[in-house]
Amino acid sequence: MNRILYVVAICLMVTQYAQAQDSTVNSNTNFFNTNIDYAVQAQFSIGGSSPLGMPREIRKIESFNPGFSFGLEANATKWIHENGKWGVRLGLRFEEKGMKTNARVKNYLTEVVKDNSKVRGYYTGKVQTNVSNTYFTIPVLAVYKLSDKWNLYGGLYFSRLIDNTFDGYVSDGYLRQNTPTGTKISFEDGSQAAYDFSDNVRKFQWGTQLGAEWKMNKHFKLLTDLTYGFNNILEKDFNSIDFSMHNIYLNVGFGYSF
């Protein structure tokens, strides 16, 4: 008799456990299928790595080319408010950020390579800079449904560098070695000296993202947003450029909602 009661008790426990598991699975299934939108999107970016304001060392920007920067993203938006007005969006984005600039500078702190040796000092003349960095980015955004057609969104993004270029050259000028009154090294008659700070690009970036999207129909949408990097794109202890540079980009794209 005791054995029968024991078996019945075990059966009841197993049944209750199975029901609890089914409830958990159903709950998880409902979470990922109810009040949630999945989307993929592509974007084109215009901008660059820029200081905040014009440093006194940069006297003139002679040319600026943002190049062709492209991004792809997959994201999910979970609508959490009872009337579906507010949501939280989490995504994964592959994106490029780059630019080319030509500037005329004065007493611009830099480090160049001359005769296979690094020379640090204050440069006056022309500087060309090439930046091309690739990131994996995770945006974490709040979304507000303004109407059936319009959504507004904003929040933070966190980026991990996966490929990096930050280089260029100086020409048509001179460099004062170590100090603004140090030994003069001239670069004239087409003479150039290269620099390469690619290894000094910061591996982690974070910033803010603000934008809007317009639904063309049930599946397709157009979007635009602005991203601003809070931290310098170069490492904290890097001192061959004496001002901070931030990623500032305007992004325009389109998306498909499933």
Where do the PLM segments sit?
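Extracellular/periplasm-exposed beta-strand and loop segments of Gram-negative cell-envelope proteins
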Residues: 48-67, 97-134, 161-203, 231-249
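Early exported N-terminus immediately downstream of N-terminal targeting peptides
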Residues: 87-98
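Repeated loop/turn-to-beta-strand initiation elements of outer-membrane beta-barrel proteins
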Residues: 84-88, 149-152, 218-224
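Short connector loops at helix/strand junctions that flank enzyme active sites
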Residues: 67-71, 85-87, 133-137, 147
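Transmembrane beta-strand segments of Gram-negative outer membrane beta-barrel proteins
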Residues: 30-46
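Outer-membrane beta-barrel channels and translocator barrels
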Residues: 33, 77-83, 147, 217-219
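Cleavable N-terminal export/targeting peptides
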Residues: 1-35
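Residues on the lipid-exposed face of transmembrane beta-strands in outer-membrane beta-barrel proteins
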Residues: 42-44, 70-78, 92-94, 138-144, ...
